[in-house]
Amino acid sequence: MQGVADILFLKGVDLGIVRSDTLDYLEKKGYANNIKKQFTFITKLYNEEMHVLAPKSINSMAELEGKTVAVDMPNGGTFVTSAIVFERLGIHANFAYIEQRLAFEKLKKGEIDAMISVQGKPSKFNSSVKDENLHFLPVDYAKSLQPDYLPAQLTSEDYPSLIPKGERIDTIAAPAVLAAYNWAPNTERYRRLARFVDAFFNKVATLQQPPFHPKWKEVALNAPLAGWSRFRPAQEWLDRNSSTLASADTRRRFDQFLGDNQARAFARPEDREALFRQFMDWQKRQPMTR
């Protein structure tokens, strides 16, 4: 929620990163009316996964009924996502507003029953956890969560000290959004945002390559966002570059098709390129669907 407040009220701030579920939460809880009309979105960025850390004596989200769960501070994204998820799953937990490091100490001492963090994997904090008595709880992709969240997994590659080798934990992810204040088109602030869009969109392909963070690969510039209006210069850029984006999307689908295990088998660039050409030939032979 802090990101939303900064965009609305902090002098000189034109845009920021917010979770896609935050504006809906503020509106439904009566904190603001028609708040989405004050915002526009540039693009969907990366996904932030829900990490529910608990003792091994607790095995499911349902077992957190009536338990004490740390959800970080009440003005943060972890709190908002936790509040929405627990409400939609019908789980009534006692939320404790405790900073992450302190919450971890309380969890180890048994003073709380679980702690939640919603962060892009692998998160620095969860990667540092080494306690054989703790594990991640699975978060099922229930129908009630599907309008606002995406299915995700935490793997042993992400957290080797918390997840046994070769295993995966189902969870959900909240999309992070690059959002901006909805300035009028005839203002200098609007024109500055338009210049930013042009510079940023032209650099995204570079940011999706090493040595930059793997999360950049989740950025899909042309991905729609339900209930949000896209900044007009951003949409105009997408319209001008639609063919280039289609090619990039094909490459991304190919990488997903390969998967982690197959990717290791085709580690050499020349092997991956040869397989990619076969993949493209296969796509061309597929019947058109309407």
Show the residue positions of the predicted features.
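Solvent-exposed, acidic/flexible segments
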Residues: 1, 19, 43-46, 71-79, ...
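Short, glycine-/small- and polar/acidic-enriched structural segments
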Residues: 1-63, 70-73
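Solvent-exposed loop/turn segments at secondary-structure junctions
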Residues: 2, 21-25, 49, 58-60, ...
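Residue-level preference for short coil/turn positions at secondary-structure junctions
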Residues: 11, 65, 172-174
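Pocket-lining segment of extracytoplasmic ligand-binding domains
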Residues: 20, 30, 92-188
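Bilobed "Venus flytrap"/periplasmic-binding protein-like clamshell domains
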Residues: 47-105, 109
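Ligand-binding clefts/hinges and TM-proximal coupling segments of bilobed small-molecule sensing domains
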Residues: 74-85, 152-226
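An extracytoplasmic/periplasmic, membrane-proximal ligand-sensing/linker region
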Residues: 102, 108, 119-132, 136, ...
